[in-house]
Amino acid sequence: MFKSFNTTGGELSDEETKAAVELLVATHGGDPYRKLLKELLPVIQERFSNLGWIAVRAIPFMDPEFKSSLAATLRSYKVKLDEDLSKNPYGVPIATGAWGGSHQVAALAAHLYFLHQSFPDIVGSEYTLRGLDYVLGTHPVSNVSYVSSVGAQSKLVAYGNNRADYSFIPGGMIPGVVIVQPDYPELNDDWPFLWFENEYVIDTVTTFILAANAANALAR
């Protein structure tokens, strides 16, 4: 039985939806993919936090009913999202497990940008800007940017392939602050070997690049 984890990709229904959207866009509204996305709409609505930002890219090729269904789901999703984000003063999804949460913060910043583009009357630009502010220094413990070489002060000792040199890779983004339960935020500035705080991960960096470009577009 297929199980999604780490390098295996996401849930099969998620991957099917992503592929359908990409093929719809690539074929400029190909009928098989429009039909499939209509069939997948219940999946998109159920897993909106993962799929909503992807599904809105299909709107130009779908009927008005598809867009209105996404809008209704987005309104419900936003109520729960705002409730969750209000639990900390930064207004972002801070991780409370054993891994720093910079990736999920950058991902939310990027995802909400796409939702803002499609539904500016429902989603504002503040989610994207708050997310970028967080990874660049507005976070617990310090004001050090999680992105090496980006920001006035940035993480210059990290878990990359040169970690034994206590060095860094420009542009790499670390996971960041870990909340040691119940309430102690930790980020070691000078010890690179705690990978759950300091490891560079490729998809995290690409997510930051997407979020940074989104914030730049909003600021123009």
Can you say where each PLM-predicted feature lies in the sequence?
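Flexible helix-coil transition and linker loops at the boundaries of alpha-helical arrays
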Residues: 1-7
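Aromatic (Trp/Tyr) and acidic
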Residues: 13-43, 50-86, 95-220
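Short hydrophobic beta-strand that contains or immediately precedes a catalytic carboxylate
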Residues: 89
